[in-house]
Structures are given as structure tokens and as C-alpha cells.
Amino acid sequence: RLRPGAAGRRDLAALAAFALVGVTLFYASLALAIDAGGISLAFVLLYTAPAFVALLAWPLLGERLDRRKLLLVAVAIAGVALVAQAGGGMRVGPAALAWGLASGASYASYYLFGKWVLHHYAPVTVFAIVLPIGAAGLAPLVRFAPSKPPEAWLWLVVLSVVSTYLAYLAYYTGLRRTEASRAVLVATVEPVAAALWAAAWFGERLGPLGWAGAA
């Protein structure tokens, strides 16, 4: 039965652990991967998440792993690689690879843990608990600049509410209705959408390989 209210003690511990993996480790490792290897490599490694989900959803969630699903995972990762390569600037090294794969594995936890938690709690309850705990875990890694102009604070609020909280609510609502391995494949449209927004807002352009990857 779905419980939209407060979490029990045992479940609260599980939610806190997920917060540290899915929020703290995810955002920290992605930032460190970008710093070590550049945005392009970081996002190629981030989107190894479909492979983690497809392989682990089989023993953990009982989802079928067949050739078609493995092929779709390979095609999705190849597409992300082509879109990212169009941006250039990859710097391959041990730290970049380690942090990038850590971001992919921690991102996969959203889907694997999500399928369990959505049987017990509404998405609103999940993220009301998970996001503050995960953000607190990131606090030691953040350098705060107290003197920000009002528009900067406005954009921080927009990013927090629209791009984070509401986005997570939307995709957990979708995750409830489909397999984890299928949902994570759909989510690989994110770098394509980012490339289109970059073209519209900042004048960045994809080359032929980038458009091939988007397709």
C-alpha cells in the first residue's frame, strides 16, 4: 500500500542512504568528473547508467534482460558519446574515468532504488526527505559566496524547484509506470535536449556526428 505520509525509522535509514548515494555522491562525482576530464567525457560516463540499470535490474527487480534491451543500451550509450564528442575537450585519465563511472553508478541508483521506494511512498514524500539530506552531505564541498545579486538567488531558486525538485517528481511519476531499464533508456534524451537548448540559447552547434548521435 502506498504511504504518502511520514517514513518509518527503517525506511528513513534507507532513504538517508539513498540520499547520500543518489544526491551527495552523484552530484559530487559528476562535478569532479567534469573537472578531471571535461564535460564531454563526464557525460559519456554518466550515461553508462543504462548499462548498470539493465544488468542490476535483472537480479534485483526481476526485470528480463534480453538481447534487444542490451542492444538498446549500447545504441543509447553510443549516441550519447557522439553528442558529447561533438563538444570536444575530452581529457581521459584515471581520475576522470573513476569519477565518471561513479556518477553513472550513483545515477543508476535512482532507478533501482526508486522501483522499491515507489511501492511504499509517494514521490513528494521521497524527495522531501532525500533532497535536504543529500544537499547537507554536499555542504562541506561547497564554497559559499554570500554576496550574490538578487537575480543570482532567483536563478538558484528556479534551478532548485524547477530543474531539480519538479524534474525528479516528474520522472519518478513516470518510473512508477514502467520498467527501470526502460525508463533509464528514455532518460538518455537528456543530453540531446541539452544540446538543443545550447543551440537555441547560446548559439552552440552540433556537427554531423552530434546529430547522428542525437538521432
Where are these regions (language model features)?
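Transmembrane alpha-helical segments that form core, pore/gating elements
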Residues: R1, V53-L55, P59, V73, ...
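Specific transmembrane alpha-helical segments of multi-pass solute transporters/efflux pumps
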Residues: L2-S40, L46, V75, L82, ...
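Juxtamembrane helix-entry segments on the extracytoplasmic side of multipass membrane proteins
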Residues: A7-A13, L70, Q85-S106, R143-V158, ...
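Hydrophobic transmembrane alpha-helices of multi-pass small-molecule transport proteins
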Residues: A16, L56, L65-A86, L131-L138, ...
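Hydrophobic/small/kink-forming positions within alpha-helical transmembrane segments
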Residues: A19-T24, A28, P50-L55, A81, ...
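Helix-helix packing/entry segments at the starts of transmembrane helices
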Residues: V23, L41-T48, F113-A135, T164-A200
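Hydrophobic alpha-helical transmembrane segments in multi-pass integral membrane proteins
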Residues: L25-D35, A81-M90, G134-K148, V192-G210
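Hydrophobic/aromatic residues within transmembrane alpha-helices
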Residues: A33, L45, P59-L65, V117, ...
